[in-house]
Amino acid sequence: MPPPIAPVSNIVLSVSSLNRQVRDCLESAFPLIWVGGEISNLTYAASGHVYFSLKDSSAQVRCVMWRSRAQLLGWRLENGQQIEARTLVSFYEPRGEFQLNVDAIRRAGQGDLFARF
């Protein structure tokens, strides 16, 4: 992770520049990771992209699964499902929003269930 930028009183960043730096820091700090939680606020967009929040008992994060990845899923997501999502952490610069770009999804515990049989 890059060292934090030391505050300098005479430097003023534009919002775009700040958001770009935040994006670069976040995206370089986190590799492709699995994140588990419950689906909420699920939207299937006309474009084919899937938008939802992934939450646990004390936090939530916005997620997007692009059409090209969503087409490979093979089952329909629903609010309330417990899942594990393989994600890339990203920061959407135009709105200054942290989100997860979802690459793949599996039902939570699916691996354990199949291992028993």
Predicted features along the sequence, with ranges:
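Acidic, two-metal ion nucleic-acid-processing modules in DNA metabolism proteins
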Residues: 1-117
